[in-house]
Amino acid sequence: MRVVIAGAGTAGCVLAARLSADPGIEVLLLESGPHYRAGAWPPELAHAFRIIKETHDWGFTAQAGASPRGVHVPRGQVVGGSSITNATIALRGLPEHYDEWASFVSGLDWNAMLPWFRMIETDEQFGAAPYHGDRGPIPINRWPRDQWYPLLEGFAEAAVARGHAWVDDHNAPGAMGVGPTPFNMQGGVRRTPADLYLDPV
């Protein structure tokens, strides 16, 4: 059996890796952008918090033809897709959001999605919690507070002073407040489906 996958974004990388595990399936993965190995990205891609990219981007706008007023919608043109060009934030929705979606599409409720969240992640701070994973391919980390920029520290202090709750884990069910953002990074380096799923095969 032969399978052609158009686009090596997040879904394309995972699908190609999963299908290629079957020796009876030949997989051809097509991508118009370049392929960089983990950690060998050009400076523009290495900086996770630089959202607007001059290269490796499809140049989409929210309103086609409305230039120069159209809102830029960053979409990665590179193996790994937008997982290479985004800010690496690994933040889940709230359980009630998934339950609401399930009223339109069955199987998207929180209890149905939780096993999948757990399967794909290794949460390096909270992996032992029942709503986190500790054996998945995607590492989840939070910057230690002693490494925060002064602006972030000031924001957090001001929010707590105004009565917002401190939250250590924003991916915990019911989390609401201020605290460290979960990222899919390891040792300060972004991790993506390209290097976690595709490169090993």
Please tell me what each predicted stretch does:
Residues 104-201:
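Conserved redox-cofactor binding core of oxidoreductases
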